[in-house]
Amino acid sequence: MKLNPSKCVFGVTAGKFLGFMVSQRGIEVNSEKVRAILELEPLRTVKAMQSLNGKVAALNRFVSKATNKCLPFFQVLKKSFEWTDECQKAFEDLKKYLSSPPLLSPSMPEEELYLYIAVLQAAVSAALVRDEGSLQRPVYFISRAF
């Protein structure tokens, strides 16, 4: 195996890995990906809506009940595109949530994990968490629409 020295980093406590910020504290969302969503204006075209959905999909593991939060966006794509008040509220709520996204905690081998499942009318969501003292820290979020 050959390593490219200019691409190698040794002895660091944090860094970008596969698009995420990894540190001793856990896995953080890449701030550039969040900024791309936070700086968006209300969407005017189907293409812009598809772009937003792609950006949110890249951050799904950090967003609790992501499908439920983004359901108005999916519904607009199925019909003729119209930015509704419901879309605007969902967009603002998503921006508010992403302004302070959770830190995902790494799990340890043989550690006991807990899975919380929420079944809603149009989506199912799950949160994988671990105990850290008296707190429960998120490990991973997942959600799907019906």
Where do the PLM segments sit?
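Secondary-structure transition/capping motifs at alpha-helix termini
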Residues: 1-3, 129-137
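Acidic, metal-ligating active-site segments
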Residues: 120-130
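Two-metal-ion RNase H-like nuclease active-site motif
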Residues: 111-120
